[in-house]
């Protein structure tokens, strides 16, 4: 079971949804990096449960504890251990599911592979595991901001069949966090919230799409063939719970264009290190390497699998049973998934930034 990610900037998460705590060990972070603990807490607050009436009612404070690696606001270059204690577990909600495979959950596949079933809150398959990723991602964000002024912004673009079409170049974090669904389009966000509430009343759920924009990306991040930047971003984002699709740049819509329409022409420049393009269908990455343009991505999330409707399924003996979930769950994961997307993008970019310096700093380019 893999719980680690990254080559130089490495994270290992631990803990279960209804265990004593969840957390992360972050190794490979450079020393003397100024880290604001409040910014880490702010990211955790953005993903915590119980923050609004369109999220799960599970009530967790998610207060971060720094156990090692940071002293007086600066990193030591040693492993950074961060912990969040679980305080509102209700494993009894899952007693009736002990030997039942919930539709579209990890129960069945975990049983097939490991011979065990983490029915209580989903165990490691729960989105609660992402607390460690978000905490480590908050450190990665500060590293990227300090050395590159890089800004990562993610927002909800679509909920069910309700979609926003806002000018992404002008989007700010303040706009994104101005409402509980985290869509910077004021009119559309109201419609999204009402749709989620409607489905919640029906005991149902919905999915959607999160869009991510990364500004001030250094050129040269990523490597050819197996360590392409977009490949690592895809793996990172598709490792998040409930993800079902990834696009970068023009994505699937680019297949409708001709080469003459899709190509991003370079602009004449006296400084080749600041090369720019007339368009950005590539999404800021060409040949697996960042070109200095904004990185633009979309990530698809499926409807929450746990719903309040009675469903047919089978138990561990293969017999058909009826089940109805009792646990506390999000009717839509997207509002809380926004900081998770930010975190995974930050972790990939921080890792590639350090890899690039390790490989190329001695080269006279």
Swiss-Prot record:
Q: What Gene Ontology molecular function terms does this protein carry?
A: chorismate synthase activity; FMN binding
Keyword hit for Amino-acid biosynthesis: yes
Q: Name one GO biological process term.
A: chorismate biosynthetic process
Q: Which residues bind FMN?
A: 124-126, 287, 302-306, 328
Checking PROSITE patterns in the record gives:
CHORISMATE_SYNTHASE_1, CHORISMATE_SYNTHASE_2
The record describes how the cofactor is bound as: Reduced FMN (FMNH(2)).
Its GO CC terms? cytosol
Query: Keyword annotations for this protein?
Result: Amino-acid biosynthesis, Aromatic amino acid biosynthesis, FAD, Flavoprotein, FMN, Lyase, NADP
Its pathway is: Metabolic intermediate biosynthesis; chorismate biosynthesis; chorismate from D-erythrose 4-phosphate and phosphoenolpyruvate: step 7/7
User: Which cofactor(s) are needed, names only?
Assistant: FMNH2
Quote the record's binding site residues for NADP(+). 47
Q: Read off the InterPro entries from this record.
A: Chorismate_synth (IPR000453), Chorismate_synth_AroC_sf (IPR035904), Chorismate_synthase_CS (IPR020541)
Which reaction equation describes what this protein catalyses?
A: 5-O-(1-carboxyvinyl)-3-phosphoshikimate = chorismate + phosphate
Family that this chain belongs to: Belongs to the chorismate synthase family.
Q: How does it assemble?
A: Homotetramer.
Q: What does this protein do?
A: This reaction introduces a second double bond into the aromatic ring system.
Q: What is this protein called?
A: Chorismate synthase
Question: Which organism encodes this protein?
Answer: Prochlorococcus marinus (strain AS9601)
């Amino acid at each position: 079971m893999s719980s680690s990610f990254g080559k130089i900037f490495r994270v290992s998460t631990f803990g279960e949804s209804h265990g004593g705590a969840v957390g992360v060990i972050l190794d490979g972070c450079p020393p003397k990096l100024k880290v604001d603990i409040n910014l880490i807490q702010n990211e955790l607050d953005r993903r915590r449960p119980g923050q609004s009436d369109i999220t799960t009612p599970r009530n967790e404070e998610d207060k971060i504890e720094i156990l090692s690696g940071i002293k007086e606001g600066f990193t030591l270059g040693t492993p950074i251990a961060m912990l969040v204690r679980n305080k509102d577990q209700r494993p009894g909600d899952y007693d009736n599911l002990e030997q039942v495979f919930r539709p579209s959950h990890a129960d069945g596949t975990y049983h097939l592979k490991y011979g065990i079933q983490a029915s209580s809150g989903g165990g490691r398959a729960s989105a609660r595991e992402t607390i460690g990723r978000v905490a480590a991602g908050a450190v990665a964000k500060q590293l990227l901001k300090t050395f590159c002024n890089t800004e990562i912004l993610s927002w909800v673009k679509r909920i069910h069949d309700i979609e926003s079409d806002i000018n992404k170049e002008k989007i700010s974090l303040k706009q994104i966090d101005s409402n509980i669904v985290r869509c910077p389009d004021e009119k559309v966000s109201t419609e999204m919230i009402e749709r989620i509430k409607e489905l919640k009343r029906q005991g149902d759920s919905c999915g959607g799409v999160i869009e991510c924009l990364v500004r001030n990306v250094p050129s040269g991040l990523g490597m050819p063939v197996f360590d392409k930047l977009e490949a690592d971003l895809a793996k990172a984002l598709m490792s998040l719970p409930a993800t079902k699709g990834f696009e970068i740049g023009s994505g699937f819509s680019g297949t409708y264009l001709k080469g003459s329409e899709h190509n991003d022409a370079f602009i004449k420049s006296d400084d080749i290190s600041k090369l720019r393009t007339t368009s950005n269908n590539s999404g800021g990455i060409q040949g697996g390497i960042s070109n200095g343009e904004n990185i633009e991505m979309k990530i698809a999330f499926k409807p929450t699998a746990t719903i309040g409707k009675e469903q047919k399924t089978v138990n561990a003996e293969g017999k058909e049973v009826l089940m109805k979930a009792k646990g506390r769950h999000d009717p839509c994961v997207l509002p809380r998934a926004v900081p998770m997307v930010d975190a995974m993008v930050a972790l990939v970019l921080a890792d590639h930034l350090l890899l690039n310096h390790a490989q190329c700093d001695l080269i006279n380019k």
